[in-house]
Amino acid sequence: MGFNLTFHLSYKFRLLLLLTLCLTVVGWATSNYFVGAIQEIPKAKEFMANFHKTLILGKGKTLTNEASTKKVELDNCPSVSPYLRGQSKLIFKPDLTLEEVQAENPKVSRGRYRPQECKALQRVAILVPHRNREKHLMYLLEHLHPFLQRQQLDYGIYVIHQAEGKKFNRAKLLNVGYLEALKEENWDCFIFHDVDLVPENDFNLYKCEEHPKHLVVGRNSTGYRLRYSGYFGGVTALSREQFFKVNGFSNNYWGWGGEDDDLRLRVELQRMKISRPLPEVGKYTMVFHTRDKGNEVNAERMKLLHQVSRVWRTDGLSSCSYKLVSVEHNPLYINITVDFWFGA
């Protein structure tokens, strides 16, 4: 009886001891787990913060990239620029260099300029026929670039240079300028510009209108009066479509004179009117020069003028043959050099 009681107590004691040990082990393991978990909370917070920061940075980069690739749409420039000054006193420095003109026009690149603050209403190509008139070209570039920029134009200046050895053909050079310029840009408007004429008033807008426009109402050499009734030379403006419609200039005027009157007749044959600015606006200074060798008066000009109505469809842009020697994009202008075969 005593033995059984002792055994029974011993068994209960061992069972209790075993249970206590189990609870102790479980408690120890649980406490270690919670301590470890508590210690890991700051690390987890740091990880999540860094992850969130990376996510925000990633989104920011995406937004930045999208913003950089998205094209900003500018408003149209006003029909009358706020930068216009009106009549200007022109100064022609005898020691002017091309480097000076370039330094004065830092925003012109490869002969092109467009306003940054608005979208220009027209893309305008200025075509200047040229041979052996370097000083005149410098004076024109010095004054014409700021003049055009104040008018908020998207423009390019093309100087079409005739290679030596042939009689000068201004009209054919202008046909070449039109054809070659359109290979670079779908220009809206073309200004056919003599190298020795410099505009005095920037309200004389170098834009195209519903009808062809004659810009030289007067010049200093004629007392600022129109040279003669019907005069259509010096500086004229025709849209891409207008010039194409008249088949451009005739290619047959070798030497000086007649090609401007020929163009006027072509315009009139298409029942287009000619507009001009007000006399006080369409004023130009002609830089003095003597007649160039190779640009003598064309003795055939009157005979050619009598043929315009018969030949204008076949003589012009449609028949303009030439050898393209080079196209050079200088800082202030695009130089196009061509060679003609005399009589072609």
From Swiss-Prot:
Main location group: Golgi
Membrane-crossing residue ranges in chain numbering: 13-38
Disulfide bonds: C77-C118, C189-C208
List of residues binding UDP-alpha-D-galactose: 129-133, 168-170, 195-196, 224, 256, 289-291
Cofactor: Mn(2+)
Family classification: Belongs to the glycosyltransferase 7 family.
Keyword Transcription belongs to the record: no
Consequence when changing T337A: Impairs localization to the Golgi apparatus. Abolishes N-glycosylation. Impairs the interaction with SLC35A/UGT1. Impairs the catalytic activity. Impairs keratan sulfate biosynthesis
Binding site for Mn(2+): D196, H289
Catalysed reaction equations from the record: N-acetyl-D-glucosamine + UDP-alpha-D-galactose = beta-D-galactosyl-(1->4)-N-acetyl-D-glucosamine + UDP + H(+); a beta-D-GlcNAc-(1->3)-beta-D-Gal-(1->4)-beta-D-Glc-(1<->1)-Cer(d18:1(4E)) + UDP-alpha-D-galactose = a neolactoside nLc4Cer(d18:1(4E)) + UDP + H(+); 3-O-{beta-D-galactosyl-(1->3)-[6-O-sulfo-N-acetyl-beta-D-glucosaminyl-(1->6)]-N-acetyl-alpha-D-galactosaminyl}-L-seryl-[protein] + UDP-alpha-D-galactose = 3-O-{beta-D-galactosyl-(1->3)-[beta-D-galactosyl-(1->4)-6-O-sulfo-N-acetyl-beta-D-glucosaminyl-(1->6)]-N-acetyl-alpha-D-galactosaminyl}-L-seryl-[protein] + UDP + H(+); 3-O-{beta-D-galactosyl-(1->3)-[6-O-sulfo-N-acetyl-beta-D-glucosaminyl-(1->6)]-N-acetyl-alpha-D-galactosaminyl}-L-threonyl-[protein] + UDP-alpha-D-galactose = 3-O-{beta-D-galactosyl-(1->3)-[beta-D-galactosyl-(1->4)-6-O-sulfo-N-acetyl-beta-D-glucosaminyl-(1->6)]-N-acetyl-alpha-D-galactosaminyl}-L-threonyl-[protein] + UDP + H(+)
UniProt modification remark: N-glycosylated.
Descriptive protein name: Beta-1,4-galactosyltransferase 4
Cytoplasmic side: 1-12
E.C. no: 2.4.1.-, 2.4.1.275, 2.4.1.90
EC primary class: transferase
One Gene Ontology term from the biological process aspect of the record: protein glycosylation
UniProt pathway annotation: Protein modification; protein glycosylation; Glycolipid biosynthesis
UniProt: N-acetyl-D-glucosamine binding residues: G258, E259, D260, D261, R301
